[in-house]
């Protein structure tokens, strides 16, 4: 492609158009959710997704009480529990008024990108294309196969707020860690539904000891982490705060869509098997040259999901590490079935984080 033809081509791309529409009002809030994209610094253009959620808090709405009763699945809460800061913070995201048809503008690498109108659930998903050279300006990502592209939302004049987002631009080779959340890095007690709801809505999140340090040691050497969980997007702010507070490495989040208006809170407890298979499959297909470590727990169906994916992607999946909370054995009926045709040396049951491989041990699995 000649320089003239390239310039003409770039000028026709959507991101090159003047972007001005921004419907954000002062009573609306936006959450920018981390995303990822395959990155090749030798490519002329880089394609990457943006993900935003726009809503208006409705804490004093008439239907709040009924929805809260649904949300807690009939668990009797004391007045003190209902008024606790933890419960109010966690439950408020389920009670917001999701804003449909709102348009936002993102500032990315000196470009203004007009995002499409939000959907009924308040979410906006947009695929952007920018010149790779613009993403690398000012030395960003120098000497790194993978790095984080940061961006912001444009706010109306006089609005003092700032909304900041991240896109993980990930190189073709290296290690990717796919991690479950509940009972893998955070104590949830998923198998006891009453305890699960209390740990989710009433108690401070408690980390699984040692997991943050182990993940950090991997990321320090260049690994990228993807948190894939059956939790709903409404818990993303709390989960992101939790991972930051207890010093888990930052990464992308992959959670389920859920609206209390569309069903019941019992849908929150539905097995996430199909969702996890689809989300992780996308990661594997996006990065065919990367090696993957899957980390989960035995409380639900992580062994079965990970085993199925390992059979589909034999060369990529080099470790399946399962936190053993149900007294499993690798040679019992369940694990034998879950890991059928998966090399035994790639399967690990662990009780404590120090049983997970060090970075040097992980590299030996390449």
Q: Where do the model's predicted regions map?
A:
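Asp-based phosphoryl-transfer active-site loop
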Residues: 175-188
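Short, acidic loop-to-helix structural element flanking the phosphoryl-transfer center
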Residues: 201-224, 233-237
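Short, surface-exposed connector motifs at secondary-structure boundaries
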Residues: 217-226, 285-292
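C-terminal cap/substrate-recognition subdomain and adjoining C-terminal extension
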Residues: 231-366
